[in-house]
Amino acid sequence: IDECRMLHFGTLSLTDEPARSATQAAVEYARRRGKLISFDPNLREPLWPSLDAAAEQMLWGLKNADVVKISGEEAEFLFGCGCEKSAELILNDCGAKLVMITLGSEGCFIKNRAAFRRRA
């Protein structure tokens, strides 16, 4: 971690201990050292004891990331709204600097303080 410029993680390592604690410690260590943090919440329902547990860990990841790549379905699951509003919540409430919401065959929505949409 000391030698990297960016640390990327996803929710698969947040499902169970001891991987969860190790991932959280790595993210916190990297943040203290000024590394860029990238997060991809990949909701795989069968891996979680409950959807509440999944949401809790996904939100932890969002609040600790600078760059977020999330699907439209995952954003809907967490925030109950469309991609533009979800991106605003991730930027403003969670503190990310850049959000990419994938939209399948419709391309993706990318937002920092300016936004654009591209077809795949």
Enumerate the language-model features and the residues they cover.
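Conserved phosphate-binding/catalytic region of the ribokinase-like
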Residues: 28-32, 83-120
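Helix C-cap/helix->beta junction micro-motif
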Residues: 32-33, 64
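Conserved phosphate-binding/catalytic loop of the ribokinase/pfkB sugar-kinase fold
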Residues: 1-21
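Hydrophobic beta-strand scaffold residues
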Residues: 37-39
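Charged helix-capping and loop-helix junction motifs
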Residues: 20-26, 51-59, 81-89
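Active-site beta-loop-alpha junctions enriched in small/polar residues
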Residues: 12, 42-46, 73, 104
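Structural recognition of alpha->loop->beta junctions
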Residues: 52-77
